[in-house]
Amino acid sequence: VNGSTCGIQAAIMSVCNPKDKIIVNRDCHQSVINTLILGDIEPAYIYPQIDNKTNILMGIKIEDAIDTIDKNLDAKAILLTYPTYYGKVYDLKTICNYAHSKGMIVIVDEAHGAHLGLSDKLPMTALEQGADIVVQSTHKTLPSFTQSSMVHIQGERVNQERLTSILRMIESSSPSYMLMSSLELAVDIYETKGKDLMDELLDNIDIFKKNMEKYKNINIVQADVHIEEE
């Protein structure tokens, strides 16, 4: 109930000790940077692609991620933002597999992707692609109250007891029961009505795009915007 900021803090500090190294995308959320400062953890950055026409950050290149991993084999983990704040996704599965082959834990800030599992028309979720720890802002794209988020863990690489212990240290000892209840309600809506609601939303988005075509001064940026090499 301290937002995804709390989840990010717990995820990073559960796998990294002071002076350890972690690989992160440079366009990460401020909570990542703040956690590295608080935990005295060294970052190795992967810089994102930038669309030259819109200046929109378009996510990282797989080649850059692999190259950064190879140059920082002493890193304990890699943290990636997926999807980006602009909705851009990339081949996370390849990065997860490669990071795992080098003994690294994969943390994903999926703050804007809690809805991805609701339709086959949407990109694969971070968990489906092999991430070990995924932090989601349930309040952003699912119907829980603002500040309520979730941390998901899968596999045997993560020390769940350590993560839980750190959560207890940094999370409020007086959590709002309204926020916690809203998370339970969001899960119920997700499971019982989520797919139908998402289908309706995707149809409405298509209608909106078609309606915008008549406005010459408005351009809709597509997910596959071409990025010119400098």
Residue spans for each PLM region:
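Conserved PLP-enzyme active-site core in the AAT-like
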Residues: 2-222
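Feature for intrinsically disordered/low-complexity regulatory segments and propeptides
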Residues: 221-229
